[in-house]
Amino acid sequence: MMSNENFDNDYNLPPPNDSAEDLKIFIKRYERSVDSTLLEIDENKREALEKYIEERDRKMKYEIECNERLQGWKKLAIEREISEEQSGEVQFPRWIDEWANTKLGGIFERIFSKMDSMQNDMNSRFDAMQNEMNSRFDAVQNEMTSMKGEMAEMKVEMVEMKRETIRLNTRIDLLEQKTEARFQSIEQRFNSIDQRFNSIDRRFDSMEQRLDSMDQKMETIDARSCRSIMLTRKLENTTRSDQGYLASPVPFLNGNEPANSGLPPIERVEDIDELSKEQCVQYLKGYGIMFSPAETIKLKKRLRDAVGLWSKASTEYEFHQFH
């Protein structure tokens, strides 16, 4: 048997030859080892989270300081620019003055000469464009004259179309009047049919009420008939019991036979004594016999009386407890 203090497998798998006690000790130590490892992992996570929060705060502080410096510098630049504009002492670089004195004059001369040539070119192009536009305007004017003639013809056709439209509208109005009259006639016929159907529905409702009443009466008759059959069979079993014959099956109040419910037949008082409590309760419920769930032997006596086993031998029979 191995010692309870040491395990050579380093908590990987229990050795196959250990006893049950060794195995229980191994399991407890393994659980403690797992809990210790999980606690160490949680501690590492907490330290990493604290370090992350510290770095994030340092970054935010650095960004705020940089933004404050930039805002200060921008504000200083704007103040200096406003001060220079108000004093009028803006100093241009020296190279701008030298460049303006030496090269700017020649550049302006070349620009002015080029602008003159461009103006001449534009004037010639404008004259050519004006001539072309005049010729196009004349063509358009001629086309407009021909279009005016066509428009006059179209006006005449439009007048004819309006007259034809008026005639069509008159015919449509007549058709609408005739259609409206026909629809009213059809609607009156449908209303008459609806009234007839309503009358038929009322008759059907009356017939359904009568049928429901007949069903209730039939159910009452069936209940009375089943109870009458049950009492007749019960009295018959009383006579048969006195004469030493086997009892006949007594049907339930709903007309079903006990055999149809999977219950064993009752032909003598010994058959009742062999029933289980569940079977005895099922018999009593079928016959409508009131009982207490705590009863035992009294349940069998109630069932004996319910099936008509009233002979002296049956009433003196000593029932046993349920198995």
From Swiss-Prot:
Q: Which domain of life is it from?
A: Eukaryota
Record's InterPro entries? Mug135-like_C (IPR013902)
Keyword Magnesium in annotation: no
Keywords assigned by UniProt, alphabetized: Coiled coil
- Which segments of the protein form a coiled coil according to its record? 27-63, 131-225
Q: Does the keyword Coiled coil apply?
A: yes
Query: What is one Pfam family matched by this protein?
Result: Mug135_C
- Family, per entry: Belongs to the UPF0612 family.
UniProt protein name: UPF0612 protein C569.01c
